[in-house]
């Protein structure tokens, strides 16, 4: 008689639950080890208890290498599919932008007066209305720019006038101050008293002749000597 089907549900008894966890955990780790040895398979087993304790087994030397390989196998196909889908979306977006660029280039040629032969009367009238509207906008913008420039020039003119008035006021103030200083100096010069005549002492000449210490005889009392000491007359008397 075969074994009946066992209903799987949470074990309510805490001790029984811990015992069952230990037995099943050890059995699972043993099966993983046997599978890696018997079948030469790369096996990685990770178990967390209800308390958060970690139990693990890895048939290779590095659990990280096995997990990285698992990540490449599991998510590589998804990334490839997503990349292919993104490429398709990018190509469709490129085609839309390309068509829009061609339309804009053709419209630009029509505005410049090129390739008008393929346009009918209705298209030409529409193009004319577009050009008229563009001209009105251009003229309006040009007028606004001129008004702005005029306003700027008026402001600069007003600023220069203010500077000119300020400089003129300063110049007048400096002139008045200089005039006052010069006037005060002239008044002080006129009010200064003249020098009295007694300041200069006249030189007094002494008319009394100082008598010479040598007694000089008058000229008419001197008798000319016609002979020298030797008694010989000079040559001019001969």
From Swiss-Prot:
Pfam families: K-box (PF01486), SRF-TF (PF00319). It comes from the Eukaryota. Probable MADS-box transcription factor that functions with J2 and EJ2 in meristem maturation. This is MADS-box protein 04g005320. Its main location: nucleus. One of its GO terms (cellular component) is nucleus. Keywords: DNA-binding, Nucleus, Transcription, Transcription regulation. The keyword Translocase does not apply. PANTHER family: SERUM RESPONSE FACTOR HOMOLOG. Residues 87-177 form the K-box domain. Residues 1-61 form the MADS-box domain. One of its GO terms (molecular function) is RNA polymerase II cis-regulatory region sequence-specific DNA binding. GO terms for biological process: positive regulation of transcription by RNA polymerase II; regulation of transcription by RNA polymerase II. Gene3D superfamilies: Transcription factor, MADS-box (3.40.1810.10). It is found in: Nucleus.
């Amino acid at each position: 008689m075969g074994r009946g089907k066992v209903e799987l549900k949470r074990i309510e008894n805490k001790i029984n639950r811990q015992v069952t966890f230990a037995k099943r955990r050890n059995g699972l780790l043993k099966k993983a080890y046997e599978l890696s040895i018997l079948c030469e398979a790369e096996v990685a087993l990770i178990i967390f208890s209800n308390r958060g304790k970690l139990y693990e087994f890895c048939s290779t030397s590095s659990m990280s290498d096995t997990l990285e390989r698992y990540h490449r196998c599991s998510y590589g196909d998804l990334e490839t599919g997503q990349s292919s889908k993104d490429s398709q979306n990018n190509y469709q977006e490129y085609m839309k932008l390309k068509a829009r660029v061609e339309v804009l280039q053709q419209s630009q040629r029509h505005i410049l007066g090129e390739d008008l032969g393929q346009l009918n009367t209705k298209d030409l009238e529409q193009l004319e209305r577009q050009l008229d509207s563009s001209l009105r906008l251009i003229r309006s913008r040009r007028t606004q720019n001129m008004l702005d420039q005029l306003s700027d020039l008026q402001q600069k003119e007003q600023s220069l006038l203010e500077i000119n008035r300020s400089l003129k006021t300063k110049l007048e103030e400096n002139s008045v101050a200089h005039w006052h200083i010069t006037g005060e100096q002239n008044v002080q010069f006129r009010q200064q008293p003249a020098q009295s005549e007694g300041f200069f002492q006249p030189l007094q000449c002494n008319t009394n002749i100082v008598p010479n210490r040598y007694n000089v005889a008058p000229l008419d009392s001197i008798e000319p000597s016609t002979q020298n000491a030797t008694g010989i007359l000079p040559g001019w008397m001969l």
